[in-house]
């Protein structure tokens, strides 16, 4: 049987990022053959990823990549905020974003397939389920800028614009803070407006106001509603005395489109009863 040296284990660990004991066991199984040991670990990594696939991944980070006139914003999920802060996990998320910008995949499934080997490797290293939840690519003749909020990288935006990068970045910060649904009123679908109009009309009628007054109330509320949900209509967070549209115009900048994500939006997190887990473990 081949001798398994500390250097062999260290080299395999450096190549795979896995634990010392896992690497040593793989080398023993491979009878000292480095390539075979690496293959064994890759196979086991895939099996481990499969076992973890059913576990909810609701934490994670956002990452972006801009490759010329192509930009991508991605959300990559894991199970705990502890792993979300791990440098290896963050590096994987950045790799996913770079891959999305370079390859411009048509779906999450296609992007996931492109990064599957790297996903299995980081799952094997960190021991949590991970997944590419969503992404968006903007391929444009215009300019692109991204803003990721805070060290935890859980909220962010990719902005397509014309004009000043500094101004566009400030507007990106506003988008993360104020959460507009779209750029302008023209992008709000008629069904949404009519639904709001119906609600406001019923409220006005119920208040007993005269018809002409009620109609003015409804139109006023519609204008307020549109201002609240559109980027251009919102009061600019850095100067509430002007709208984003006014700030943009006076600084020679126009936002064409944006995509905004917040990690975990819409994912139901499983409540963990740690006391029950400890009690169950004590019975084993």
From Swiss-Prot:
- Function, as annotated: Associates with the EF-Tu.GDP complex and induces the exchange of GDP to GTP. It remains bound to the aminoacyl-tRNA.EF-Tu.GTP complex up to the GTP hydrolysis stage on the ribosome.
GO molecular function terms attached to this record: translation elongation factor activity
Q: What is this protein called?
A: Elongation factor Ts
Taxonomically, what lineage is the organism?
Answer: Bacteria, Pseudomonadati, Pseudomonadota, Betaproteobacteria, Neisseriales
Positions of region (Involved in Mg(2+) ion dislocation from EF-Tu): 80-83
Q: What is its main location?
A: cytoplasm
Instruction: Mention any one GO cellular component term assigned to this protein in its UniProt record.
Output: cytoplasm
Alphabetized CDD domains for the sequence:
UBA_EF-Ts
What keywords does the record list, in alphabetical order?
Cytoplasm, Elongation factor, Protein biosynthesis
């Amino acid at each position: 049987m081949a001798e398994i040296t500390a250097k062999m284990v260290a080299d395999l660990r450096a190549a795979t990022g896995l634990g010392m004991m896992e690497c040593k066991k793989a080398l023993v199984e491979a009878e000292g053959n480095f390539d075979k040991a690496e293959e064994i670990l890759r196979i086991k990594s895939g099996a481990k990823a499969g076992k973890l696939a059913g576990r909810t991944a609701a934490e994670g980070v956002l990452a972006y990549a801009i490759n010329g006139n192509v930009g991508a914003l991605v959300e990559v999920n894991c199970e705990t905020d502890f792993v979300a802060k791990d440098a290896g996990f963050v590096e994987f998320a950045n790799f996913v974003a770079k891959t999305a910008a370079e390859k411009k995949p048509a779906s999450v499934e296609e992007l996931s397939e492109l990064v599957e080997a790297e996903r299995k490797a980081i799952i094997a290293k960190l021991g949590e389920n991970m997944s590419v939840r969503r992404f968006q690519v903007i391929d444009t003749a215009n300019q692109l800028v991204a803003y990721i909020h805070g060290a935890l990288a859980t909220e962010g935006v990719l902005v397509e614009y014309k004009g000043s990068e500094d101004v566009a970045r400030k507007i990106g910060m506003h988008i993360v803070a104020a959460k507009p649904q779209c750029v302008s009123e023209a992008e709000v679908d008629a069904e949404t407006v009519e639904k709001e109009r119906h609600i406001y009309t019923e409220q006005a009628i119920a208040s007993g106001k005269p018809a002409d007054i009620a109609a003015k109330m409804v139109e006023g509320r519609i204008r307020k509603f549109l201002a609240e949900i559109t980027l251009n209509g919102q009061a600019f967070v850095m100067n509430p005395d002007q709208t984003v549209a006014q700030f943009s115009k006076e600084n020679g900048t126009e936002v064409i489109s944006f995509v905004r994500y917040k990690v975990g939006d819409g994912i139901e997190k499983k409540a963990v009863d740690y006391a029950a887990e400890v009690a169950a473990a004590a019975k084993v």
